[in-house]
A protein has these predicted regions:
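Surface-exposed, short loops/turns at beta-strand junctions within beta-sandwich domains
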Residues: 96-105
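Structural beta-strand segments of beta-rich domains
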Residues: 45-49
Length: 128
């Protein structure tokens, strides 16, 4: 009887530890740089979006990094960033190809998603 009780308790503890130890992991946004400057070569303003993202399991698990910019009128601009280096995801766009205006205030949402559907998001703002 003692052996059966010990076995049952050990199975219960094992099940509880296995279930309680699983912690879903998600990407981790740890740096953001957004800038706008005039580029004489293109005769236009250039927007530079840079986001540094890590993943606790593997960097290759990061599927996408997106930036959403909202102006004071509620208009939204969206950019899908590309990986460029170990942690860096970035995009460089000409202002004429966007509805952005250098010097305006923008609320910014950044979302990093991995292949398992877990996300990290960061909210910030831009004002030149």
């Amino acid at each position: 009887m003692q052996i059966i009780r010990f076995f049952a308790v050990s199975m219960l503890l094992s099940a509880l530890m296995t279930a309680s130890c699983y912690v879903p992991v998600s990407p981790d946004i740890f740096g953001v740089h957004i800038s706008c400057h005039f580029n004489e070569g293109y005769d236009d303003h250039m927007w530079i979006f840079q986001v540094w993202v890590d993943h606790p399991v593997q960097l290759q698990d990061i599927r996408e990094v997106e930036i959403y910019l909202y102006n004071a009128y509620g208009e939204m601009s969206y950019f899908d960033l590309r990986p460029d280096g170990t942690y860096l995801w970035n995009e460089v766009v000409l202002e004429q190809n966007t509805n952005l205006t250098c010097g305006r205030w923008y609320d910014i949402d950044i979302v990093a998603t991995d292949y398992y559907g877990y996300t990290d998001d960061l909210q910030t703002y831009y004002q030149k």
